[in-house]
Amino acid sequence: MPEVDNVIKEKLKLLVEMDPKKMIIYPLIVFGIAIIIIIANYVMTGSFVKEGIELRGGSVITLQGVNVSPDEIAKSIKEKTGIDVTVEKFSGVGGSGVRVYVSAGDDVNLVREALKEMFPDVEPQTVVIGPTFGEIVREQGIKAIVYAFIGMAIVVFLFFRVPVPSMTVVFSAFSDMIIAIALMNIFGIELSQATIAALLMLIGYSVDSNILLTTRLLRRKEFTVEEAYYSSLKTGFTMSTTTLGALASLWIFSTAQVIDDIASVLIFGLLADFMNTWILNAGVLRLYIAKREGKE
């Protein structure tokens, strides 16, 4: 639709005309708010982000062939036992049913008895995840994120060989992750092996878009800074919207909680990445290029 295209182009041109200093300030304010949210969550709960059963330990009760709303099951268990549980549906080649997650410290036997009352024809299957295993998973996840950042930073510095643009790319990726974690706290999404993987995916996507922008601006020839920025912005906007569309479809049509969580975290991160790449990084690069060319 030509009208929609024109509106989008006009909105993108507003970014091109924005003061570079303001482009830096606004994303930093959002980053600061995200840090405050994470710290507040730590003060209230003792954890920067709520951890799933895989990390904190607990029990997983599986009921094959059950086709009841997870919310109804969780509500009924709460009424019968006073225990808060997480319930999700699953389906696959091996069959379908529900999984009930019980935190370590809660009486799993009470939950099992409540489930037997609700579904007398189904035998609950229980798997216990010990705190030691959860600690190992947590440590491995943290190491994976740290190593990914170190590897990404090395590659970026080797590619550009210029401190300011390289550090901005690294900071943008870090900010994407921090904002995604803050939104996980707001929407109650737990940190698990799946969401750790989603956070790692964000690093790769962030680097792609930032390298596109930085390369276009630093290595432009016949274009002005504004023209190069607008050209890369249109490309980046197309990349982001198509990816967000795919993730939104995944979130809407998925029936598995783990898929919903992955899609949600990626959506949070991609929205943050659009801001950090095309506003924050662009503002830093425009100031850097203006200063560098002013000295030449």
From Swiss-Prot:
The gene is secF. InterPro entries: SecD/SecF_arch_bac, SecD_SecF_C, SecF_arc. Involved in protein export. NCBIfam families: PRK08578.1-4. Keywords: Cell membrane, Membrane, Protein transport, Translocation, Transmembrane, Transmembrane helix, Transport. The lineage of its organism: Archaea, Methanobacteriati, Methanobacteriota, Thermococci, Thermococcales. Part of the protein translocation apparatus. Forms a complex with SecD. One of its GO terms (biological process) is protein targeting. It is found in: Cell membrane. Belongs to the SecD/SecF family. SecF subfamily. SUPFAM superfamilies: Multidrug efflux transporter AcrB transmembrane domain (SSF82866). The keyword Protein transport applies. Pfam families: SecD_SecF_C (PF02355). The keyword tRNA processing does not apply. It is a multi-pass membrane protein. This is Protein-export membrane protein SecF. HAMAP family: SecF_A (MF_01464_A). The chain crosses the membrane at residues 23-43, 144-164, 169-189, 194-214, 236-256, 265-285. Coiled coil: none annotated. One of its GO terms (cellular component) is plasma membrane.
